[in-house]
Amino acid sequence: MKKLSFQQIILTLQNYWQDYGCAILQPYDAHVGAGTFHPATVLRCLGTKPWSVAYVQPSRRPGDSRYGMHPNRMQHYYQFQVILKPSPDNIQDLYLKSLECLGLDLKTHDIRFVEDDWESPTLGAAGLGWEVWCNGMEVSQFTYMQQIGGIECRPVAGEITYGLERLALYIQGVDEVKELDWNGQVGEKALKYGKVDFEAERQFSKYNLELADSEMLVRHFKDSEEQCEWLVKKNVPFAAYDECLKASHAFNQLNALGVISVTERASYVLRVRHLAKICCTKWLEMNE
């Protein structure tokens, strides 16, 4: 079997989960730290209505800035997110079959489910979960979503988050993300991951760690916080949640700069969690 390019990995996962019955959504157009922060997960996992979706989500974690010098850690990367609500009994088997569709031989690769109950303090979200390791490196997270915004998820949703770059390293048999085959072409049309993303990775690392204006970020956080609370009162929780995400990203940028103390960090986490909770509460109130 020919090794899949990075874009073919995404297309294969989209086709696999589409055939299962998932709606294939598009990435959310905001700065988020993980696919979980997409409103298709945060808001739609709440309530009793069935919801099965899959989508790619570009994700940003300023604290993981490495100037493009680390083999598999970046401040900007891609996740593939699957939400199955209610969670089917065979969700683990579905996941393993998806790996086989990607060309991973489960007999030659050491695939392990390592217990790791998941929690997002800023979202007020938690669930029973497992990291999925391939040959000792985490490539996916598998969670039974039990709580979001401090609200119980009934029914429980199953969440699968694929780390696309790390999976691609094993699928293509290369050691560094920048060497990944992006488009499966040869000659002048060939593109590697490094040519697509790594100049931006270098520049954003410099911004995240050296150039970002901490005073401006504090103002941005406060503005988004106030706007979120006001929009919830106006009964537009989707718009309010956008402001929650802006506040969350401003906090992550401040944290990456190293300008907030441990006590201040805890306070910021609680403030973002409050925003997530009021957005979730209002959305549920309007949709159940």
UniProtKB/Swiss-Prot annotation:
Keywords of this entry: Aminoacyl-tRNA synthetase, ATP-binding, Cytoplasm, Ligase, Nucleotide-binding, Protein biosynthesis
Pfam entry (one): tRNA-synt_2e
Annotated compartments: Cytoplasm
GO MF, any single term: ATP binding
Protein family membership: Belongs to the class-II aminoacyl-tRNA synthetase family.
HAMAP family named in the record: Gly_tRNA_synth_alpha
GO cellular component, one term: cytosol
GO biological process: glycyl-tRNA aminoacylation
Subunit and interaction comment: Tetramer of two alpha and two beta subunits.
Organism expressing this protein natively: Rickettsia canadensis (strain McKiel)
Catalytic activity: tRNA(Gly) + glycine + ATP = glycyl-tRNA(Gly) + AMP + diphosphate
Protein name: Glycine--tRNA ligase alpha subunit
This enzyme's EC code(s): 6.1.1.14
